[in-house]
Amino acid sequence: MHLHFTPRQIVEKLDQYIIGQKDAKKAVAVALRNRYRRSKLAENLRDEIAPKNILMIGPTGVGKTEVARRMAKLVGAPFIKVEATKFTEVGYVGRDVESMVRDLVETSVRIVKEEMVVKVQDKAEEQANQRLVEILVPSPEKQSGFKNPLEMLFGGAQNSNQTSDTQEDVEIEKKRQDVERKLAAGLLEEEIVSIEVTEQQSSMFDMLQGTGMEQMGMNFQDALGSFMPKKTKKRKLSVKEARKLLSNEEAQRLIDMDEVTQEAVYRAEQLGIIFIDEIDKIAGKQSNSVDVSREGVQRDILPIVEGSNVATKYGSVKTDYILFVAAGAFHMSKPSDLIPELQGRFPIRVELTKLSTDDFVKILIEPDNALIKQYMALLATEGIEIEFSDEAIRKIAEIAYQVNQDTDNIGARRLHTIMEKLLEDLSFEASEITLEKITITPQYVEEKLATIAKNKDVSQFIL
C-alpha cells in the first residue's frame, strides 16, 4: 500500500494520465491523504472519523471514472466500479445493492492473493522444478509399476535385490542432478512432458450471476466443495508451460488462505473505494408504477453508504470506512433530486468541466498513455513510423470538439472514433506499405474527416 503520498504528489501522478479537472483531482487527493492521517490517530478517535464521500458532476467522457480508477491504482486500494442502474429494489429480481460490497471484497482477496503469490514465487518455482525433475526422471517404483505381492508380504529376495536397488538409486540421483542442471540452464524448455493438473470445474451456480442470488450459490458451492474430491486431468505440455502451471499450483499450496482472507477483509473495510456511476439515473422523486422504484434503490444504497455490516463468504464486512465516489452527468436531473438522506452522505461536491479544443490537444499528446502514442506504437509493429504535425493534431482536436458540439457530447471518447476513422485506410494497408515513415498533415486530416464532420446527418452515424 502507498498511502504516504502527499495531496500534491497524488495530483502530479494523476496529471500523467488525466488532463485538466483540477478540482476533482484535489478532492480525491485530500480524501486519500485523510485516510493516511486517520491511520495515525489513536484507536478511539480513529473509529469516530469516517471518510467524506465524493459526488462528481459532469458530462460523459471528461474523466470522472478515470480519476477514481487511477487514484485507487496509485495506492493499491481495492476498487470496483458499479452502475447504479444495475441494482433493483429489495423484493425484485436483479442485483441487490449489497453485491457491490461482496464484489469489493472479492477484488481485495484477489489483490492480496496476488501479492502473497509474488512473495512465495521463488519457493514455488523451486518446488515446481523439483516436480519436473521427478517427472522427467521417475523413481524405480513408478517405472516398475507394482511389486510381487508375495515379495511384499514375506520380504523374499530383499537381501539379494538390495545391492542392485542401491546402485539404481545412485544412477537415478545422477540423472536427476544432470536434468536439474539442464533445467537451470534452460536447455529443456521445449521438451514435452505429461503432467497431472487440477481441473477447473465450471459451477452450476454460475447461472445465478446477475440475479441477486450469487451469495446463496457461493455458499452452496463452498459447502459442496469441502467434501467433493478435486478432479485432475493429464496434459501434455512443454517444460516451459508445465513450469508455469506447476508453479501456480505450488504457490496456491504455500499461501495461507486464512491470512489472505483476514488481510483482504481489513483492506476492503479500511481502504476500499466503491465508484457508483450513473447515480443521476436513479435520481428523481417520481416513478412510474411499471418501473422498479428508483427511490427504492436509493433507500437500499443509503445504509451501505451510512455504514452497515454486509454478510460475505469471507465473513461480515463493515462499510463504515469504505470511500464511496458517486458520479453522474445530471442532464435530466440535479443532485437535489436525490433523497435528502443520500445527499447528506456525499458532502464533497465536485463539478467537472467540459473539454475544450486545447484539452483535446493535450489529451492527444501529453499523458503517458496518450492516444497518438498508442497508434504510433501499433503501426511501428508493421515497420512503419508515423508522426503527426502540430497543425494536424490541432485539426483533429478541432474536429472532435465540433462534432461533440453538433451531436452528442461524449467528451474525450470522441477522439477514439475520430482517430479510428482517420487511420482506417493506413491501418488496413499497413502490412503492404513499403514506406518507412509517414507524416500526418492537416491536409490529410481534412481529406479524411472534414467532409464527414461538416455533414451533421453523416457525422452522427460515423463519428
UniProtKB/Swiss-Prot annotation:
GO molecular function ontology, one term from the record: proteasome-activating activity
GO cellular component, one term: HslUV protease complex
Keyword annotations of the record: ATP-binding, Chaperone, Cytoplasm, Nucleotide-binding
Superkingdom, taxonomy of origin: Bacteria
Location in or out of the cell: Cytoplasm
InterPro entries: AAA+_ATPase, ATP-dep_Clp_protease_ClpX, ATPase_AAA_core, Clp_ATPase_C, HslU, P-loop_NTPase
One GO process term, biological-process aspect: proteolysis involved in protein catabolic process
Entry binding sites for ATP: 19, 61-66, 277, 341, 413
Pfam families listed in its UniProt record: AAA (PF00004), AAA_2 (PF07724), ClpB_D2-small (PF10431)
Coiled-coil spans in chain: none
NCBIfam families recorded: hslU (TIGR00390), PRK05201.1 (NF003544)
Task performed by this protein: ATPase subunit of a proteasome-like degradation complex; this subunit has chaperone activity. The binding of ATP and its subsequent hydrolysis by HslU are essential for unfolding of protein substrates subsequently hydrolyzed by HslV. HslU recognizes the N-terminal part of its protein substrates and unfolds these before they are guided to HslV for hydrolysis.
Family: Belongs to the ClpX chaperone family. HslU subfamily.
Assembly behavior: A double ring-shaped homohexamer of HslV is capped on each side by a ring-shaped HslU homohexamer. The assembly of the HslU/HslV complex is dependent on binding of ATP.
UniProt protein name: ATP-dependent protease ATPase subunit HslU
